[in-house]
Amino acid sequence: MQLEFLGTGAGSPGKFRNVTSVALKLLDESNEVWLFDCGEATQHQILKTNIKPRKIDKIFITHLHGDHIFGLPGFLSSRSNQGGSEELTIFGPTGIKDFVMTSLRISESKLSYRIKFVEIAQEGVLFEDQNYIVNVAELDHRIKSYGFRVKEKDHPGELLVDKLKELAIPSGPIYGQIKQGKEVTLDDGRVINGQDFIGKPQPGRVVTVLGDTRQTPNIELLAKDADALVHESTFGKQEGSLARNYYHSTNIQAAKIAKQANARQLLLTHISARYTGKLSKQLESDAKEIFSNSKVVRDFDIIDIPLP
C-alpha cells in the first residue's frame, strides 16, 4: 500500500506544484489504484509515474472546486483512448455526475467503459467490499467538502505450523482446511478445531484523505489511529485568521489534529505557491514541533504504508 502524490498545490498550478490529486496504490493488495481528486493536468502527472490509467477503478472527489476536478474529463477520455474497458466508479458531492457528463457531452467524447456515479447523500459508510471499507464525513469549507477514511479489513492470522507439528499433524492439503478455521478429522481419528491453530488477526491499515477544510470535529473522527493522514496546509502558523476566513487550515492546526487523533504520520498538502524553498521547510519544521512525524509532501512523493 502506497500513496503517490500527483499534485500538492493550492488553487492554481504552479512552477513546482500541480493542483490536487493523490493516488492510493493497492497493487499488491488488490491490483487496483484509487484516485483522490483530479485537478487540472492530473493525466500529465500520471505520465511521469508508473501508474496505468486502466488500473484506476475508483475516483473519490472531495469537493467541486476547480482545482480538484478540472482534470477529470481529460483523464477519463485518455483512459478510454488507452484501451481502458473496466467500469470506473466516481464518488463525490452532488453535482459531480452533471459536471462529468456535461463535459463529455459537449466535447462529444465517447468512452469505452461505463462510469458509475455515487453522489454522497449522507455521512457514514460510502463503500465496502471484501478488502476495504470507506467512511465519509462532511468537513467545513465554502462549499460541500468531504473527508474519506479508508480502512483495510484485518488480515487473517497466520497458520501456527509449529503447533501443528508438535501434535504430529502432517503437512498437506489438510493445512488449507485448518487455516480456514474448519473442524477437521485426522486419519488417526483425532478431531481438531482449526481455530485453535490460527494466530491473531493482523490489523488492517487506515488512510485518511481530507478535502479543503477549516477545523471541525469530524476531522479527528476520520483521522483516529490513521496510519497516514493527508491534511491540507494552505497557510502557515501565523495565518490562522486567514485560514479561518478562507475556510482552510494551517500546518499547526493539522499537526494538533494528528496528535489528538493518534495518527502515525501527517502528510501536509494543498500548499500555497507562496511557500517555496525555506518557507516550505519552515512549514514542516513548525508542524514537527507539535507532531514529530509530519512531512510537507511534494509532487511525485511516494509514501509507503507498511502493515503495523
Swiss-Prot record:
Is the keyword Nuclease in the record? Answer: yes
Any Pfam family the entry gives? Lactamase_B
Q: How is the cofactor bound?
A: Binds 2 Zn(2+) ions.
Lineage: superkingdom? Bacteria
What positions does the entry give for Zn(2+) 2 binding?
A: D67, H68, D212, H270
**Enzyme Commission designation:** 3.1.26.11
The residues that the entry says bind Zn(2+) 1 are H63, H65, H141, D212
Q: Where is the active site?
A: D67 (proton acceptor)
* One GO MF term attached to the UniProt entry: 3'-tRNA processing endoribonuclease activity
Write down the required cofactor(s).
Answer: Zn(2+)
Reaction equations catalysed: Endonucleolytic cleavage of RNA, removing extra 3' nucleotides from tRNA precursor, generating 3' termini of tRNAs. A 3'-hydroxy group is left at the tRNA terminus and a 5'-phosphoryl group is left at the trailer molecule
Which of UniProt's keywords are assigned here?
Endonuclease, Hydrolase, Metal-binding, Nuclease, tRNA processing, Zinc
What is its quaternary makeup? Homodimer.
Q: What does this protein do?
A: Zinc phosphodiesterase, which displays some tRNA 3'-processing endonuclease activity. Probably involved in tRNA maturation, by removing a 3'-trailer from precursor tRNA.
Family membership noted in the UniProt record: Belongs to the RNase Z family.
- Under what name is this protein listed? Ribonuclease Z
This protein's species is: Pediococcus pentosaceus (strain ATCC 25745 / CCUG 21536 / LMG 10740 / 183-1w)
